[in-house]
Amino acid sequence: MRFYKQTKRFLLLLAMLSAVSFADAQIKVEASETVELMSIISRTAGFPEYCMDNGGQYTSDTETWFSAYGQHPTVAYVKELRKNCGISYDAVMSMAVHLNTDGQKVSFTGEKSDLEKRWQKVEIDTFLVRLNQFYSDTRFHEFYKQHQTFYESVLQAYEENVMKYFHQDWYPQFYGTEPTEQFRII
């Protein structure tokens, strides 16, 4: 009888841990300051894939705030990275998701080998110096804070119109195991 109770407790504990583990692996929707930073630098540098005008007032605010920085040294540097290393499209976001900011400066949180292969030609420390120069000179964190209400409204709309209908239990059903990664929609 004692063995049965211990086994039952163990199985209950295992089930609870599995539920916690799966909850941690659920897809989270969030706004990211570093994703916005990299997108806006790319837009300011004229990357066509980042110049779509479908953001309404936010696009207008971006143009108003950052248009004075079109000749900024970081913007010129990013244009050179596109020309010489092919940093564009998904490579921009590959870097963005490996960055972190504390509101004062931007830091690299990954390993260079984690980045999209086009970044292998880039000196990351030099890139960070330039990125932080843009971040500081443009008062990017202030811009980001001023648009929190907009980001929250977009996240809420996404939750209500997409995530509400997205069945996240497909992963273990398809692969046969629980995901061990963190999935984020940024």
Question: Where in the sequence are the language-model features?
Answer:
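Acidic/His-rich structured neighborhood in mature extracellular/periplasmic domains
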Residues: Q71-I186
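Bacterial Sec-dependent N-terminal signal peptides
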Residues: M1-K28
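N-terminal mature-domain "stem" immediately C-terminal to a signal peptide or N-terminal signal-anchor/transmembrane
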Residues: Q26-V106
